[in-house]
A protein has these predicted regions:
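C-terminal terminal-structure detector
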Residues: 46, 60-69, 75-93
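Hydrophobic aliphatic residue packing
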Residues: 5-6, 29, 41, 72, ...
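Helical hairpin unit composed of two closely spaced alpha helices linked by a short loop
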Residues: 1-55, 59-60, 64
Length: 93
């Protein structure tokens, strides 16, 4: 339940990201999974009211290239920032 958002592709991959704006660091992958594990991540996100966003290319890139506990790479900042901004706007309504 620590994630701020879960990005999916929508069924095969899911990645959970945590972002702490005051840390000065990029969002961190705190969980990721394929197939059944992806389903479990999405299910837990819904249980804890964590936003689930479908973005097939981004979910695949993060799943294949970023390990759990690692920050997202600079080339993904813009795409992830757009998703986080959208989630924050939605949650603050």
């Amino acid at each position: 339940p620590e994630a701020d958002v879960v990005i999916t592709n929508p069924t095969h991959f899911a990645v959970a990201l945590k972002y702490e704006p005051d840390s000065g660091k990029a969002p961190v992958v705190i969980a990721k999974g394929a197939d059944y594990l992806a389903f479990q991540i999405r299910d837990k996100a819904k249980e804890y009211n964590i936003s689930v966003v479908e973005n097939k290319p981004l979910a695949r890139i993060i799943y294949h290239n970023v390990d759990i506990g690692m920050e997202i790479p600079p080339e993904l900042y813009y795409a992830v920032a757009e998703i986080l901004a959208s989630v924050l706007r939605t949650n603050n309504r």
